Amino acid sequence: MDIQEQFEGYLREEVDLLNKFEDSHFKQLEVFYTNSQADHVINKDKAQFSDLPFHTTLYKEVNGKRVKLGTLLNWTKAERLDTIRHESMIKDERLRRLIDFDYSWIDYAVVLQRYLDEGNVIAPADILKFDSDFINNIKHPTEKNNFLDIKVIKECETYILMKDDNGIRDPDILRAWELDSIPDVIELDVDGEVKKFNLRKEMIKRIQDEAPVYFFASVSLCSRNLDPNISEVKLWLEYFIGSEDFFGFNGPNVVVSKSLLAAKRFEVVVNHLRKVAAFELDDESKEVMTEWLKYIMIDPVYRSYKNRGAFGNLNQHVFARTKSEGLSWSLIDIGTTNFELKPTKKLAGSYVKKFNLVDDVLVEESLKDLRNEGLYKMADITRRMIDADITPENVKKGKLNRLALSYCGYTGSHSATAMVKQFNGTKDLDPNCDPMFVDIVKDNMKVYMQEGLQKYPHGSRKINRLDILFKGGTSSASSTNEHATVNGRFRYRSELYRERDVNSSTVFKTATAGQYRVVKKISAKLKSKNANIITHPMNFINSKVSDLDVVVNAGSRLVRGTRAKRIITPNYGTIYAASLMTVLPAVRLLSSRASNMGALSTQGSLVDRAPHDVMAPQLAVTSSDDVSKVCVAKDFGQFDTSQWGQISKAHADGVRSMKVHYSMGHDALVDLDLNDASFADLLEVTAMSFEKPLKYKMNGLVCESAGVKSGELTTQTRNTTTNISHSTVALDDYNNRAYRLNLPKLELVTDNKVGDDSVEVLRVVDGSPLTPEIAKLYVSCMQDHADRNHLEISAKRTIVGNNVAEHIKIWVFKGYLALDVFLDSVTSEKNSFSNLNYLEQVNILYDMAMTLMIRYCSVQACMTQFCNDMKLLNGIRAGNYTFIPTPKIICAYGTPEICLRAPEIRSFGRYLPIDKDEYSVLNDLVASLSTNKPKMEFVSQMIEQNGNKVHSLWLDHFKRKNDVNPNGGGIHISEGLKRLMPEYCEKHLNELVYKTLDDKVIRDYTSDIIISNICKGKLSKAPKLAFYANFYLSLTNTNGVDSPYLTADEGVKNVHRVIGLSYRNTLSTSPTSNVDRILRNNPGSAPAYLTGNDILGVLSDYPYQNWRTVVELLDITEPSATAIIEVATNQMHAYLADKDLNTANLFDNTSRTYDISDRTYPKFVNITSSLSNSNRRGFQIEAMKHVIYMARRGVAVLANTHPTKIGNTVYYDY
């Protein structure tokens, strides 16, 4: 069989897989919702919603063929479900109490009753009782007791949980205590006065704040896949049923019956089953994870938290003493920003002994800690991995402790306590710092400011400042006290209700039978930063000296890995605006990385690059025979808040040093107007915001935060400055000490510092091998200089060596890399998943699968989980109806458009040999699911009821600046162009403001429109494919390298072998991002409300010869005008593909590692020469999708657009 026939055969198999997926999907729905009772052909049968049965299958008929659209559920007929899940079937008293507690468990109760009827028993488990010593940890800081001498507290109306000799360990971590064992009310002595404290109520409140459970699907559906015969499920059932440790939901909030963490136990067992399956763990690894599951089930969050230290101590040493060979990467150019992974051959028998510093005492202590907890299997397997051979299975074994910490999903700690601990940081240490270190911090900040302002001087020019403010600069938070409000009533008509739904407030009858008017009251504040800038610009423009004393609302976020809650500290509006003008250039400087420079030049990090780019130097060092090269990774703790006092003053002075270059400044802070202020005065505002501790409030607590603020614009820049300075003094100190001790010197070759994360490559200057003496001395120097400057660093967690390295949770060993396991989670940090529309939910599940595939999972495991998860999605609900689309939409235009065996190749579904009519219907179905008309109708009604919210300052600022006649130009002015022209921009600006509202009624109305239109046969028309061509394949030569992604899917590694590894993702930047960059770098040359998406959208409606006129009508001037036209000329193909699909960009977490670039196109693609450059690039990408598909199977092919002879067959493109 020739290669073309093989390829076509593979695609036919893909269609068969899709059909099987669809069949299994609908069979699962029959399990959930009983068998379908009727078929409804939307373009033939009339839709009388009230007449439809509970479970209907929807079709569209085309050319005599029926195409399945999905399942429609009519909840007014839901009594049909009761015949299979009637309460009378539940005999076990515990199960009856379960459904009394929360009736949504009825389906699972039926499953469990059958299990019990078969003679099985569910025994009770022992639930943890309240520890009365905890009461001693409850503290009440007050002004009278000097806030317990905690200096950061300025006001307090709440309690905190602090260490006490008579208390419990880590009181701020929520325990799984039995509710009835927690005292309802206790008496506490507060400043000599006895006060009553509602302890049980406070503990229950903590559940939602510290251990919420937001599943991606309803818990009742998730539980249906929990077979009670599985041993791990039996363990959970001993709590859930045996001890009646029930949980349910009141809206998004967890409600419990018996213990505080009943829902977390459920999440733990679900996560365990998913991860064991997805990671395809071997029997030994399964035993380790089952041991862990049994251990943490007793007290999930705390038992995870208490082992974090031991796990971290051991995790860094995986493969540290391995003797196995790895890959071999060249060290050529490692000292420049052009360094790229390139393989090099090792000489036969050239094995050299490498070295990594391992603290054996710490290892043994950590192993002992694990064994003391009963985690013998975890301890043994982790210890073995220090010396183990490097294999895919051993990499997984080495990461089992990380996997274990992911079981609890998102958790946090007591909010007020977290705030005190985080703000206090290292305040108890000596406030004095090493003067040399402080000077280096200042000098580094000065250099970043100087080079940043030279490259991006726009904020120093008054004419640009409003444009910079409007753009907002970054996603960093800001806080103000004034916000616009929106009040009104949103109205729409619906046929998805019935008579008994009518009430006096939201659902009303109309004169038309079967139609109802839905009215929802709207009352909201426009709190988004972008909306606030448009509605209240004076909150950002008029700066007062007292603004640095304003108490700002702090935020918080939960994290995975059972760590303490993170407190977010944004800047006040005027301080944020000053930062945009002054230090944003330095932020951008450190976010870019120019080519053809020395690796140690002032530059950015590689944090946003593919992992093999980020870690390229470390991959080369750990694989090289040059044992004089050394990788060093530091581990800072509390880094933000440890930079108080003299360090923050050094940051401030580095900013202040720029004042000498600008006139009319004052020596101290003054009230100012952003538009007229001297740039020197703006620099002083920024400097003082660094130097002066700022106040934040949250949950009845006001605290003062010194050091780096975790939500400010310059968090990463300031952290990077201090990080580099610490490395500088530590290296200088090492070389001074080494000289005295007769040890060789070290020199820095390259580094990558991202905030508090740091990885360096050093070289032993005389070329001798790294030795334990060198490593220990360098670690000692790093520790000493942290101690001298009230920084917190763990010497025992510092990695030094040339066998293994780590940076930003990417581990490197002998030329291979492993990524983190904190990916797949059935829950999210906030209740955000349920607020997404159906296609967005599918995309998140898909992205999760793609991330797993490049890390630890096979395509089979990833897509099995993806398909199973899709079956659990709730579908689209409106009124009394739910529509669940066919899962085959994943291959349709407007979704990831994938095939199941090569899912990372987005928009490849168009090449599957699916029936033409069926594919057209699926595309139209996706277009119907993607409608944004309801959102725009909501915005329109709110504008009509609330009027203009755009501040007059902006309407005046955006008046046309060029002298172009808006009615001239000789071209037809489309509605899309008109709305973006300065003369008509008020409506557009108001839409930007109102669109920031995300009210539930918008989702309800959108769902209503989708269901109504689909059932009535009013499918939207899908856009035409931007690019499609028949390609003919022939064999060619491979061009790639052995993959460093050792545990990735085998097909992914085949692509690396056939095509190669990407380099800096040069083609992954979207056209809209490129236009946005032009606008950002040239403020004032275009109205600031324009985006790359706006401009390219309008240009795509016009022929090329009209583009200059369109740009002028948009009031875009030079230098942006020509640059934008150039981007549009070269990249309109990519925009057209991205515009309709939204997910069509080829680059995701997996495919961005593939070398799809100008250097691989000539080797794998042969495009007809008559195409324009723009179209040529579009078809080159389409052709590469075919090449990647075959490369996954280890076959290198050339994709041709013209007829070619393959074997005995000649293929023609008709």
From Swiss-Prot:
Q: What does this protein do?
A: RNA-directed RNA polymerase that is involved in transcription and genome replication. Following infection, it catalyzes the synthesis of fully conservative plus strands. After core assembly, which consists in recruitment of one capped plus-strand for each genomic segments and polymerase complexes, the polymerase switches mode and catalyzes the synthesis of complementary minus-strands.
Per the UniProt entry, the Enzyme Commission number(s) are 2.7.7.48
Q: Where is the RdRp catalytic domain?
A: 610-805
Recorded catalytic activity of this chain's protein: RNA(n) + a ribonucleoside 5'-triphosphate = RNA(n+1) + diphosphate
One of the GO BP terms on file: viral genome replication
Q: GO cellular component terms?
A: virion component
List, in alphabetical order, the Gene Ontology terms for molecular function in this entry.
Answer: hydrolase activity; nucleotide binding; RNA binding; RNA-directed RNA polymerase activity
List locations, semicolon-separated: Virion
Q: Does the keyword ATP-binding apply?
A: no
Family as reported in the entry's similarity comment: Belongs to the reoviridae RNA-directed RNA polymerase family.
Principal subcellular localization? virion
Q: What is this protein called?
A: RNA-directed RNA polymerase VP1
InterPro entries named in the record: RNA-dir_pol_reovirus (IPR007097), Seadorna_RNAP (IPR026381)
Task: Alphabetically list the UniProt keywords.
Answer: Hydrolase, Nucleotide-binding, Nucleotidyltransferase, RNA-directed RNA polymerase, Transferase, Viral RNA replication, Virion
User: Which domain of life does the protein's organism represent?
Assistant: Viruses
